[in-house]
UniProtKB/Swiss-Prot annotation:
It comes from Caenorhabditis elegans. CDD domains: WD40 (cd00200). Disruption phenotype: Increase in life span. Longer time span to reach adulthood and reduced brood size resulting in sterility between generations F3 and F4. Associated embryonic lethality and additional somatic defects at elevated temperatures. Defects in germ cells including defective sperm development and endomitotic oocytes. Significantly reduced H3 'Lys-4' trimethylation in both embryonic and adult germ cells in a sex-independent manner. Increased fog-3 expression at 20 degrees Celsius. At 20 and 25 degrees Celsius, double knockdown mutants with wdr-5.2 have increased fog-3 expression. Residues 1-24 have a biased composition (Polar residues). One of its GO terms (cellular component) is nucleus. One of its GO terms (molecular function) is histone binding. Belongs to the WD repeat WDR5/wds family. Pfam families: Beta-prop_WDR5. This is WD repeat-containing protein wdr-5.1. Component of the SET2 complex (also known as the SET1/COMPASS complex), which contains at least set-2, swd-2.1, cfp-1, rbbp-5, wdr-5.1, dpy-30 and ash-2. Within the complex, interacts with cfp-1, ash-2, dpy-30 and hda-1. Interacts with histone H3 both unmethylated and methylated at 'Lys-4'. Interacts with jmjd-3.1, ceh-6, sox-2, sem-4 and egl-27. Interacts with set-2. InterPro entries: G-protein_beta_WD-40_rep, WD40/YVTN_repeat-like_dom_sf, WD40_repeat_CS, WD40_repeat_dom_sf, WD40_rpt.
Amino acid sequence: MDTSENAASAAEQQPTQQIDQLTVPNAPDGGSSAPAPSTSPNSISPSNPTGTPAPGASAQTPNPNAAGASASGSANYKLMCTLEGHTKSISSAKFSPCGKYLGTSSADKTVKIWNMDHMICERTLTGHKLGVNDIAWSSDSRCVVSASDDKTLKIFEIVTSRMTKTLKGHNNYVFCCNFNPQSSLVVSGSFDESVRIWDVKTGMCIKTLPAHSDPVSAVSFNRDGSLIASGSYDGLVRIWDTANGQCIKTLVDDENPPVAFVKFSPNGKYILASNLDSTLKLWDFSKGKTLKQYTGHENSKYCIFANFSVTGGKWIISGSEDCKIYIWNLQTREIVQCLEGHTQPVLASDCHPVQNIIASGALEPDNKIHIWRSDV
């Protein structure tokens, strides 16, 4: 079985509504999309990860010309530095809410915590027996939860590197995870087709949702933790009531391609969903309508993360199987920049909560994390 990679990919105009700092349209949008693959894609990274310990992490000063801006748009991200240390594919990269740290997970079975001030690896968290597919931060930036092919999740305390809980219950690869905003619950999705909700204090599963008919690729809480979005290879995005575990909405488009990633917008009114037909869609989930679709990248095999950037320009950001990171104008759907520098598909990406910084991570044999900065 493969191990660690996750995702995203992306309709039209008339901006009117404010989403926190994001303005999005309320008119549905059309757009053609490539046919969905005939079979469910493979999990996500190299199989049978070895236990080879990662070498000491380093920060390297890269060629500033590695990032290329498009002729249109105003994004001007440039490669700031490269972080090395993981020995296998990078599956996810997440900035801490405080912005001081970057957490990365890998098929090498480890989670690394990088200090963003000094661009060094401060801690390597170990304990999983197989590759790690995803991580998430608690709201106070004190803990991370990790999801692994070993069918478990683990909660680590960052200051001490201590593993405080192991969450057991899934009977197949655990592919995705997230804390609720209160950091009292963890939600997880698995290849066993279920979504589970866990009590952080006790480490016990308090709800098991028979969520989908294929592997669950992504889970996301909304801004107050009252709702959970889940995406699956069955082509559905489902919205769940956290308190009672009931499905309150199912989003599906006409062609029903596998869903590789889902994420609530900052104000919780919209959902960004990536499909394995090389599209990213922005949904008004209350109306069950697609508002915008973003295309131009390649995404037919892996689960690739996608992001809202709100610190400078209002962008949608995603990795791609052509080894690049794509940046779209949220409103116009135009590709405003394409970042080049990785040598393998880019599954992991995240946007810094305060600064105009993007982190990206690639599959092996690249295994590198690039840090990009913009002054716009």
